[in-house]
């Protein structure tokens, strides 16, 4: 039995690779792809999701665009990381299909209503769409198996000293999600910064020599540019969003702890911080499985193995 999932994303190079990995994995039944603003503007992230699904031949998956901006803040985008299109680097096909004529939240609600078993939500961008779904469809919470998200950090941020980008873009949305009572797995910077892909890994992917692997290598070539800045101290580039899919496929590659996580929505220096109570210093109930380490080679091998399926 394959696991039913909905991917909510803001493509973005690493979102695109997460989509490619998921579509190559028969263990996952992708019920829908929804998009949010984040790495680029909402019209660009929607267009990019359609282009990636066209590339991998999955035009059967329903796609819908979601919120145009965060719940109560101005939109921040990461064009310094992902370029003008959001997927700068490779030449991608234009979409061979149209998005659904409805909002992302409406599409997710429809799928949850019709589902015969609980569905896993996999958000890899800001949590605006997920928060709107949870706030407006409380009757569907029981239809959600869990939320496996990329976001947050127990240590330092990557957009501010305290905050990771996805959470910082819409901290109020993240607050709703983490307070929802639905089981959460958090793939934050603690683990994704250990899930780095190196130059030699990219060359191995290029040598797989099918069209999807070629595009993946070219996506990674561009993604490397930003991460070569010495301030990060990286040997390669961290593949943030694919960690969510890899955890669903091979959780044994990861190490985790269970603890309470809260979202800072007020701090002048700490806005968007994920407060991780690793040592149970509060009485707050455990709400999150926090991933903090990964078998890097196993992770890269999984990606290469699935790319060969194309």
Curated annotation (Swiss-Prot):
CDD domains given in the database record: nuc_hydro_IU_UC_XIUA (cd02651)
EC nos: 3.2.-.-
GO-annotated cellular components: cytosol
The protein's enzyme class: hydrolase
The entry's keywords: Glycosidase, Hydrolase
Superkingdom of origin organism: Bacteria
GO molecular function, one term: uridine nucleosidase activity
GO biological process, one term: pyrimidine nucleobase metabolic process
Keyword Hydrolase: yes
Active site: 240
Record has Hydrolase as a keyword: yes
InterPro entries: I/U_nuclsd_hydro_CS, Inosine/uridine_hydrolase_dom, IUNH, Pyrim_hydro_RihA, Ribo_hydro-like
Recorded family membership: Belongs to the IUNH family. RihA subfamily.
Function description: Hydrolyzes cytidine or uridine to ribose and cytosine or uracil, respectively.
Protein name: Pyrimidine-specific ribonucleoside hydrolase RihA
Organism, scientific name: Photobacterium profundum (strain SS9)
Name of the gene encoding the protein in the UniProt record: rihA
